[in-house]
A protein has these predicted regions:
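An N-cap/entry alpha-helix motif that binds or orients negatively charged groups
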Residues: 103
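Glycine-rich beta-strand-centered segment in the early N-terminal region that forms part
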Residues: 20-35, 44-95, 100, 112
């Protein structure tokens, strides 16, 4: 796959990367389009700490190309808009419906590769 990989502030490079198989509860999405927002700019500019190298992109749409063994809600070929945040689902904030405020939240394209 082709990926825009950030190696440091203002150092983004197009690279070919191996397509990883999904874990049991994961899906692989072929990205058709990705938006750029203020968070992306701050990461690219070095104003927000991330671990390099990072495949950026957290606002995207695409098509499911593979699913893990535990995934039942998605199928290959399905078009999707992605919610990039993983929350714990267990803390008080998550239980109150505020999963976006979870202190254990991880975001695709920010905390882990997009």
């Amino acid at each position: 796959m082709r990926a825009a990989v950030l190696h440091g502030p203002r150092d983004i490079r197009m690279e070919t990367r191996a397509l990883l198989a999904p874990g049991p509860a994961e899906a692989v999405v072929q990205v058709f389009a990705s938006g750029l927002c203020g968070t992306d700019y701050r990461i690219w500019n070095g104003d927000r700490a991330v671990q390099y190298p990072l495949i950026m992109g957290h606002e995207f749409i695409g098509e499911v190309v593979a699913v893990g063994s535990d995934v039942q809600a998605l199928q290959p070929g399905q078009k999707v808009a992605v919610e990039p945040n993983y929350s714990c689902g267990l803390c008080a904030l998550c239980r109150e419906g505020n999963r976006n405020l979870c202190l254990s939240r991880t975001a695709i394209g920010i905390d882990v590769n997009g």
